[in-house]
Every structure is written in C-alpha cells, then in structure tokens.
From Swiss-Prot:
The gene is Fam209. This is Protein FAM209. Residues 83-107 are annotated as: Disordered. Interacts with DPY19L2. Interacts with CYLC1; the interaction may be relevant for proper acrosome attachment to the nuclear envelope. Residues 1-20 form the signal peptide.
Length: 170
C-alpha cells in the first residue's frame, strides 16, 4: 500500500513538473501587440489572457495537493516504523516492559558485526605473520623460508590488545 502511494505521488509530481516545463515556454511574453499576428501569409487572432493569469507553477491548489501528498507519505512511513518498534500486543498495556533490544537487532547489523570480527581476526593473523617474519630476519635465518600458516611458537603470536594499544592482555 505504501509503495503504491509513493509511486502515485512520484508519478503525479513528475507529470505536473513536466507539464509546467512544457507549457511555460508557450506562455513567454512577446513584445508583439495583442490582436492580429502574422502567421505565414495569414493572420491569426491571439487570445487575450488576463495579466494575472497563473501558470502551472503558480497554481496554489497544485502546491497544496503536493504538500498534502508529501505529508500523507511521511505519515504512513512513520506509522510503519512505529509498528516495527512496538508490537501490537504491547501498545495498549504500559505496565509491561518494552521488548529487549537484543531481540530487535537487524540482520544487516549482525552481518556487519560478524564481518568486523572476521576482519579483526585476519588483522591479528597478519600482524603475527609480520612479527614472525621480523624475528626470523633478526636471527639471520633463511629469508626464503616460508612462514607457516599455524606458527609453531604460540608465544610469538600477537593479541588484539597489542594491536589496539591496550596493555592488559590476558
């Protein structure tokens, strides 16, 4: 329902702006006197429009309609958000506690958190490999030696606390 309302509003706004743009060029004022105007080899009679005739953009009813449609669209959008935040069973009863925020975590936030956790783990692995490579270079061992995926020296691994500069590493 809301999608249909939004598309109707958008379509009506586009049509009204297109008509205003097309017909505004026809209303441009010319310096010719009203009355008979030469057109080809013939004379045509120009209609005398009153001085205060309004174009499409000057029509106050059109702007009122557009403002009302925008208000209605925003009102429906606000109702949809309120329904998502407060379940219908809890609306009338104020004695119950609101739903817990942990239950309302959206899948996109959960995905973002998981992605950041994976990136953090990859950063720890990368820094550990760099540190192991530095140690092997400092001890003048063979520089062509491959750094294993799971290092044998577990005490040489970097923790996330060392990366972020926190001294308390457990």
């Amino acid at each position: 329902m809301r999608t249909l309302l939004r598309w109707c509003l958008f379509l009506s706004l586009c049509v009204s702006c297109a008509c205003a743009f097309m017909f505004s060029s026809m209303r441009e004022k010319t310096k010719e006197s009203p009355g008979k105007v030469p057109c080809g080899g013939h004379f045509r009679i120009r209609q005398n429009l009153p001085e205060n005739a309004q174009g499409w953009l000057g029509n106050k009813w059109l702007w009122l309609f557009v403002a009302i449609m925008i208000y209605v669209m925003l009102k429906f959008r606000g109702d949809g958000e309120n329904k998502e935040q407060h379940p219908p069973g809890l609306r009338g009863c104020q004695l119950r506690s609101p739903p817990k925020k942990a239950q309302n975590i959206s899948p996109s936030k959960d995905f973002t958190f998981n992605t950041l956790t994976q990136l953090e783990m990859e950063l720890v692995k990368f820094v550990s490999k760099v540190r192991n490579l530095k140690v092997s270079m400092a001890t003048n061992s063979n520089s062509r030696q491959q750094v294993p995926e799971s290092p044998t020296n577990l005490y040489n691994n970097v923790t996330i606390y060392e990366i972020w500069g926190e001294e308390d590493s457990e």
